[in-house]
Amino acid sequence: MFPIKYIDNNLVWNKDNEVFAYYELIPYNYSFLSAEQKFIVHDSFRQLIAQSREGKIHALQIATESSIRSIQEQSKKLVTGRLRDVAIQKIDEQTEALVSMIGDNQVDYRFFIGFKLIVTEEKVSLESMKKSAFMTFKEFLNEVNHTLMNDFISMPDDEINRYMKMEKLLENKISRRFKFRRLDKNDFGYLIEHIYGRDGVAYEDYEYSLPKKKLKKATLIKQYDLIRPTRCLVEESQRYLRLEHEDSESFVSYFTVNAIVGELDFPSSEIFYFQQQQFTFPVDTSMNVEIVGNRKALSTVRNKKKELKDLDNHAYLSGSETSSNVVDALDSVDELETDLDQSKESMYKLSYVIRVSAPDLDELKRRCDEVKDFYDDLNVKLVRPAGDMLGLHSEFFPASKRYINDYVQYVKSDFLAGLGFGATQQLGENTGIYIGYSVDTGRNVYLQPSLASQGVKGTVTNALASAFVGSLGGGKSFCNNLIVYYSVLFGGQAVILDPKSERGNWKETLPEIAHEINIVNLTSDKENAGLLDPFVIMKNVKDAESLAIDILTFLTGISSRDGEKFPVLRKAVRAVTQSDQRGLLHVIDELRREDTAIARNIADHIDSFTDYDFAHLLFSDGSVSNAISLDNQLNIIQVADLVLPDKDTTFEEYTTIELLSVAMLIVISTFALDFIHSDRSIFKIVDLDEAWAFLNVAQGETLSNKLVRAGRAMQAGVYFVTQSSGDVSKESLKNNIGLKFAFRSTDINEIKQTLEFFGIDKDDENNQKRLRDLENGQCMLQDLYGRVGVVQIHPVFEELLHAFDTRPPVKSEVE
């Protein structure tokens, strides 16, 4: 019953002396791929299958477990900075909350594939014949010893080395198309224990002891060590197995494919991919594939054709009509014969077995019904053969044989490639900041926002900038706040531009980090006059000069292409820059000193702003010193009474107050440049809420590109929070954005624009529907590897939900 005879590294010998080499196929991301990309993957897998002209292939999809505690502990190693103790405590509390919600482990589907190694024919010589006879005799002795003593298995070193050479060639061949990892004894141990119902152990933490004793020309292992992972009481019933361990019991049932009654059209036939999303419980699948060479396959097909023709002739001679089944079968067999004859491809005898387990019989019945219904919808009829449970159970062992021939399906490589083996939805990193879980797979999603600039293998971007887009109320500000908060806890530094003054109460709502929160509230009080003057706020004089030009041209509407006015304004700003007393009020004085009609005109225009509402924040006489410090871990800059224009308002329609408000945003955002140029070893975030307000004006667009480019060099990420992906879709900016978050949108043009921004098919109706149907707190995420998926943002803690919630409070009923 137990087929394994010997294990060495990733090689497994069975009782028939067949040798298989096993690998883990590193899963590839399959979500949101276009049809064209899916066909590329399909073709690669078809070639992987078709390159073996003979032998057997054994593919397993196993629902392993990964430890939440282990991931969280790894995340703690990433924490640095002044808030380290708070962060460690927060992660520990987070761990306990997650464990209480979903248990110690979460399901993690892994894909294993084994190839039978075929011995190449040796030249017949006296030496090889002697060696063969000696090996046969030795094998006989070993078998006698094993039968009599039943305590050890001996494997000649020559035999091991011969197959190891073959395995190296095979590995070199298959790794050109997909990423593979060789299995080891721990993998096999886990696999066998898993099949026998053992759970609760994380895959990474599992250890399997298989001691070996080296002799002069052979290696011994104990039979007991080999079968130890199978220790458990197995009771077989007609349609299920009961597996009992010391501390637990489980019930297992096996399905196999009875018939495929319709076409499985690709793409949409990826069973391995869809069942990960469909089932809330773990399901394992085994594909035992025997390769039938082209000549043998053609011969089988032609024999079948003769049988069908005989049936047709018999019906004709007896005067009855040939049944439609026979006619259809004749058409199919003709097509298959032509196809095999032209392509010279092999055929494959497939034994497809599904394993369903549950803690009790009622739950097992419910799960079995769910699995059966899922396959029914795909035109695949499953059957649970009575009395064959143990036999089907054995098909999951590495190097196992096909148990039963009654349910074999003859398929081509196209069919096997279309099942989506190895396809999964992957998002984010293995460790880092926990932001929520994948809506499709339920797996936790972790991010490391500072990782992009490290040039990690597999990433498709080295941009630290991020974009949060979506219509009002979808959750973009909440998600943005959560990521900034945890980035600060993990050792980063942040400055948040808060135009709507939504974060003013963070010191009260986030008491554990209150000492590191610095809220700069720039009111229109007279004592704040001149605090946002470019010459006051910028350390670098050159930066101050260019910002002064930007602000004054923005307010007055003077274009740099205006040959009369611009040179006059430029000259006045240059004169102030070179003087000892620097401030925007001196620009007015300098223009009046010029005393030409144009200069007086510009001076009067600028002067008209100086006492308008909160504009005095921008104008100083040079006596004001910079009072804005950004030395804390979390800095929030607010300007009271800002009035931002509506999203659809054109620049020409801006009112004076809106013009001034956007000018303030441009000044503060430019001030962030100084923050970006601080300590390069610390990851920094410049968070621009309502970014659309200045991305829609020329000066703001130039500034955003400047911030992003400076950020990449100085390990700083610029976070754009805006309502439309169109604001960040311009080529110069789009290519410099790494992480992308898109929240719900209902406008079809906006949806298409967002999908295009993500680089996925904008005309695909399924993609459009996914974005339109997102619930509050759900977003489409594109990670640093270009993978796209849907995430449910999960703050875990009630206090964070309260702190980051920007919705207006619900009015309580008056009693």
What is the predicted role of each segment?
Residues 53-56, 109, 490-492, 517, ...:
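Short glycine-/polar-rich loops that comprise or flank the Walker A/P-loop
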Residues 13, 28, 35, 44-49, ...:
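Glycine-rich phosphate-binding loop of nucleotide-binding enzymes
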Residues 35-53, 276-279, 292-299, 380-381, ...:
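P-loop NTPase motor domains
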Residues 125, 439-445, 450-452, 457-470, ...:
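Charge-patterned, long linear interaction tracts outside catalytic cores
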Residues 100-101, 540-586, 729-815:
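P-loop NTPase motor core of the ASCE superfamily
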Residues 1-410, 420-421:
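Extended, folded cores of ATP/NTP-driven motor/assembly subunits in large transport
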Residues 312-314, 450-474, 479-484, 497-504, ...:
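Conserved P-loop NTPase motor cores
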